Regions:
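Secondary-structure boundary/capping motif
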Residues: 95, 162, 266, 342-343
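Non-catalytic surface loops within mature trypsin-like serine protease
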Residues: 91, 259-261, 338
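C-terminal substrate-binding/catalytic lobe of Rossmann-fold NAD(P)-dependent oxidoreductases
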Residues: 5, 14, 28-79, 179-182, ...
């Protein structure tokens, strides 16, 4: 098949670098253009990132020679070069909202890793295995924007991936509330230990805005499409605390869950539901989809960040330590790779879903 021509807006940051790495040899997508801030514009990609390449794998050779465009000044040029763009810029939210809408109105679909449009009512925020039906609001968004091809779709916050996928197949039992404590790697802040030495041998009990996202964004994922907008779900109620911990990659969550009276499933039922859980990403056999989305470990000391974050190329969710609790019904531990499943990898999977469903077509 002819590959889609793809651009990355915000390609020099850590998530942008992940996009560059993931698009190397992708069967559907070919990286054609990279845009960033004015200070990087005009440089070769490698010249722009050589002193801050943050990944533990080499920069793809094909990307090194690409000339970096100015994400704002070169918007018309970039939009004309590609079939769609990924967006992972570091800008104020109002500026991101305006930039993404500029590209959409230039008929360039945007698949965004940013949070700026997550609460825009006609912008789908999608985990492909959980709420692919929300893509239906794209037509209403196109009417609002006055576009034929252009639209914005976003992925959810990286913290959600370690617990929402595990809770989702249990919603049928009347999940009433959950308490979540997340332990989030420093790459979630776009940092390495070399650039953030204060995090060595440290844990910080605060990540700005993260607890609100962790409590509220699941309700949009579990919401419904109504009159061209997404109406968030009323429950389950989630309370969260979020910690920054001394790991390079991998977000872990300790999760406590309570079901409605008389609806509590057995441990065996929960494990069976996790093992059987599949979504459109698996059914469509999308290139980036894990074959088994949720993996349960019976060992009492798993999942572990170092051992399990790269399960199924970093796109699966690892679960363990499911047991009864004295205050809630059950508790368990979840783990996901925050810059793969939780960021660039999740966005690539979303783009694959959009292409497979005809929302993104080649120019």
């Amino acid at each position: 098949m002819k590959r889609y021509q793809v651009g990355i807006i915000g390609g020099t940051g850590m998530v942008g670098q992940r996009f560059v790495a993931l698009l190397e040899n992708h069967p559907w997508f070919q990286l054609t253009a990279i845009a960033a801030s004015a200070r990087s514009a005009g440089k070769s990609y490698w010249e722009a990132v050589c002193d801050r390449w943050a990944l533990d794998i080499p920069c793809p050779e094909a990307a090194k020679s690409l000339t970096v465009l100015d994400a704002e000044a070169d918007a018309v040029k970039l939009a004309g070069m590609v079939d769609f763009c990924f967006c992972a810029v570091d800008m104020p939210k109002d500026a991101i909202r305006a930039l993404e809408e500029t590209y959409a109105k230039l008929e360039c679909p945007i698949v965004s890793n940013n949070s700026a449009h997550r609460w825009t009512e006609d912008v789908p925020m999608v985990v492909p295995e959980i709420n692919a039906e929300h893509l239906a609001v794209i037509e209403a968004q196109r009417k609002r924007l006055g576009t034929k091809r252009g639209f914005i779709a976003v992925k959810s916050n990286c913290s959600l991936q370690s617990y929402v996928p595990a809770l989702h197949p249990l919603m049928k039992y009347g999940l009433e509330r959950a308490l979540v404590c997340t332990y989030q790697a420093i790459s979630g802040a776009g940092k390495t230990f070399q650039r953030w030495p204060e995090m060595v041998d440290n844990c910080i009990p605060y990540i700005g805005g993260e607890e609100e996202k962790s409590e509220q964004e699941p309700l949009k994922l579990w919401g419904r499409v109504e009159n061209g907008r997404i109406v968030k779900a009323e429950g389950p109620a989630i309370t969260a605390q979020c910690f920054r911990v001394a790991c390079q990659d991998g977000h872990m969550a300790a999760v406590f869950m309570k079901f409605k009276d008389g609806c509590k499933p057995s441990i065996e039922q929960i494990k069976a539901d996790w093992a059987a859980f599949r979504g459109p990403a698996q059914e469509l056999q999308l290139p980036s989809a894990p074959k088994q989305f949720l993996h349960y470990f019976e060992e009492p000391d798993r999942p572990q960040t170092r051992l399990d974050r790269m399960l199924e190329r970093g796109m699966a969710v690892s679960l363990g330590r499911l047991r009864e609790d004295t205050q809630y019904d059950y508790k368990f531990v979840g783990l996901s790779h925050n810059t793969l499943r939780g960021a660039a990898g999740g966005a690539v999977l979303l783009a694959e879903l959009l292409c497979a469903n005809g929302y993104i077509q080649q120019v």
